[in-house]
């Protein structure tokens, strides 16, 4: 019975070594798992970017809204019958209207 027990202990030791330190062991599993998680995060970011670019391409090829928006913002164009209002903030009134805080030196 002693030889069988010794053989089983050696086999158990070898299996534990292979599991923890050997090729494709726990260490490699954790590393690959982390690599996969990082790649999935990267893929989801790239997919969101691709979806956004795809929607913009669809809008530019078929829709007039994007063309109209760029014409308004970049070129300052307006439609016939529209009135354009530009609001300009008066910096001198903005500075004087703020309440001044007293300097308390003690």
UniProtKB/Swiss-Prot annotation:
The keyword Cytoplasm does not apply. It is a single-pass type II membrane protein. Its main location: membrane. Keywords: Cell cycle, Cell division, Cell inner membrane, Cell membrane, Coiled coil, Membrane, Transmembrane, Transmembrane helix. Residues 22-106 are periplasmic. The keyword Hydrolase does not apply. It is found in: Cell inner membrane. One of its GO terms (cellular component) is cell septum. The chain crosses the membrane at residues 4-21. Residues 29-70 form a coiled coil. Belongs to the FtsB family. Essential cell division protein. May link together the upstream cell division proteins, which are predominantly cytoplasmic, with the downstream cell division proteins, which are predominantly periplasmic. This is Cell division protein FtsB. The lineage of its organism: Bacteria, Pseudomonadati, Pseudomonadota, Gammaproteobacteria, Enterobacterales. The gene is ftsB.
């Amino acid at each position: 019975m002693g030889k069988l027990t010794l053989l089983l202990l050696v086999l158990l030791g070898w299996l534990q070594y292979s599991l923890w330190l050997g090729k494709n062991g726990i260490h490699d599993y954790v590393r690959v798992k982390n690599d996969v998680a990082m790649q999935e995060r990267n893929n989801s970011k790239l997919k969101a970017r691709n979806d956004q670019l795809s929607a913009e391409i669809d809008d530019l090829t078929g829709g007039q809204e994007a063309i109209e928006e760029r014409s308004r913002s970049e070129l300052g164009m307006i439609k016939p019958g529209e009135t354009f209002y530009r609001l300009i903030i008066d910096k001198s009134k903005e500075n004087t209207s703020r309440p001044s805080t007293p300097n308390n030196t003690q």
